[in-house]
Swiss-Prot record:
<dbReference type="GO" id="GO:0019776">
    <property type="term" value="F:Atg8-family ligase activity"/>
</dbReference>
<dbReference type="GO" id="GO:0000422">
    <property type="term" value="P:autophagy of mitochondrion"/>
</dbReference>
<comment type="function">
    <text>Ubiquitin-like protein involved in cytoplasm to vacuole transport (Cvt), autophagy vesicles formation, mitophagy, and nucleophagy. Conjugation with ATG5 through a ubiquitin-like conjugating system involving also ATG7 as an E1-like activating enzyme and ATG10 as an E2-like conjugating enzyme, is essential for its function. The ATG12-ATG5 conjugate functions as an E3-like enzyme which is required for lipidation of ATG8 and ATG8 association to the vesicle membranes.</text>
</comment>
<keyword id="KW-0653">Protein transport</keyword>
<dbReference type="GO" id="GO:0034045">
    <property type="term" value="C:phagophore assembly site membrane"/>
</dbReference>
<feature type="cross-link" description="Glycyl lysine isopeptide (Gly-Lys) (interchain with K-145 in ATG5)">
    <location>
        <position position="189"/>
    </location>
</feature>
<dbReference type="GO" id="GO:0061723">
    <property type="term" value="P:glycophagy"/>
</dbReference>
<comment type="subunit">
    <text>Forms a conjugate with ATG5.</text>
</comment>
<dbReference type="GO" id="GO:0034274">
    <property type="term" value="C:Atg12-Atg5-Atg16 complex"/>
</dbReference>
<keyword id="KW-0472">Membrane</keyword>
<dbReference type="GO" id="GO:0000421">
    <property type="term" value="C:autophagosome membrane"/>
</dbReference>
<keyword id="KW-0072">Autophagy</keyword>
<keyword id="KW-0833">Ubl conjugation pathway</keyword>
<feature type="compositionally biased region" description="Low complexity">
    <location>
        <begin position="75"/>
        <end position="91"/>
    </location>
</feature>
<dbReference type="GO" id="GO:0097352">
    <property type="term" value="P:autophagosome maturation"/>
</dbReference>
<dbReference type="GO" id="GO:0015031">
    <property type="term" value="P:protein transport"/>
</dbReference>
<keyword id="KW-0813">Transport</keyword>
Amino acid sequence: MNSGVLLSESETDTSEVSGRQSELISGDESIKGKLEEFSAKLNELRLADGNSDGGDEEESLSPDTKSQREESSENSENVSRSTSRPPLTSSIVSSVEREQLKSQVKVKIRLQPIGAIPQIQPRVCQISAHQQFLALTRFLCKRLKRKHIHCYINNAFAPSLDQNIGDLWTQFKVNDELIVSYCETVAFG
């Protein structure tokens, strides 16, 4: 009974969690690898532009000096690829890492029925903070086998379906849980 979006507190399958963590780590490594390749290509393009400007200078150098210069540029390329990145690439890497951390953050949601609608077990679930409220309503419709569900935050208001659950949680949490009441018909207003 574990959906791709919601996890209950009682369902703690460590192999599933470790599998997800390994997927995230491998995805992180592949993104970093692609960014490093992109950075290396940019460095090569910059070096090619620098070599075309100083073409007359290289013609006057002896073959020994040219080979020493090529070796030193190769060594500096290897060092720059492994230790430092251009500022643009560094900012891209940091933004990708922030997005991955944001997607890993899960918030607790307490589900409370209103009226004659059945209660969902377990009552407390977790969902990714970056998900829209629509994902939660779809989960409830699927779990309760209903076409329409009306949801309310803290029995006070019905959020829009495109609102971010993480934002709702930070603004309206009670004891680190977002209380979502649900019913089959309009309950308030």
